[in-house]
Each structure stands twice: as C-alpha cells, then as structure tokens.
Amino acid sequence: MKKKLCILLTLLMIPTMSNSTTKINLENYINSLLWEKRIVLFISKAKYVHFINETDDFFKNNSCENEARNLKYIRIVGDEINKYVMPDRYINKYGMWLIGYDGQDKSHSTDISLLKEIYNIIDKMPVRKREITEQNKICN
C-alpha cells in the first residue's frame, strides 16, 4: 500500500515539476548591468501595437546611436510579464523608463515622448559628457 501511494504521489508531482519555470528577477537583471549599460525598460500591454512598433523601430533604426550611449533595451510585452519577478516600482505600471548606470530611474513616459528626448537626456549626464570626449564613434 505504501509503495502504491509513493508511486501515485510521484506521478502526480511530475507534471507539476515539468511545468514550473524559473522567473527572471528583473531587479537582479538590472543590477547585473550597473555601471555597464544604461537601460530602456519597456513594459506594455500587447494591445498597444502602435506603441510597441514605434519603440521596436526606434531601437532597430538607431542602433549606432544607442550603442554609442551604451543603451540596453529590455522589452516586456503582454504575457511576457509573467516570466519576471517585478520590482515593486514597476508592478502594475506600463510605459518606458530610462535607467542610468547607477540603476536609478532617470525618466519615464507612458508614450513615445521619451524616445524623442532620450539622447538629450543622456547627453546631459556627467558620465556621458566624459564618454563623448573619449569616444571615436560617429553615427550618421
């Protein structure tokens, strides 16, 4: 009887174990990029197709400018949010955040307005001013 019970419990646990996935801790991921990358964190519901496309196009079409500024694009759209353990500051919030080398939010918008100002915001940062003088990268 005990043997049958053990087998039954084992069989019941296998599907549960195979469906479990490890979530990405967003705070830890952001912290792993400290002092290496500036981050644009983009969180959107899937229904905001225009917002998603505009943001994706910005990063695709401006790769040189983004690379020159050490920008890392973290894109979380729709159900992808379930893959993450979200820090309190982003729970139930949507939009776009510019996160500095220090891991702090530098700017936020709930539309594409941040993309229009992002280079100006970054280029005014003290560390970026130093980077500009040291960089040889020229983008067209």
Segments predicted by a language model, with ranges:
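Non-catalytic interaction/Regulatory regions outside core domains
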Residues: 2-5, 16-140
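Repetitive helical segments and hydrophobic/amphipathic motifs
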Residues: 11-12
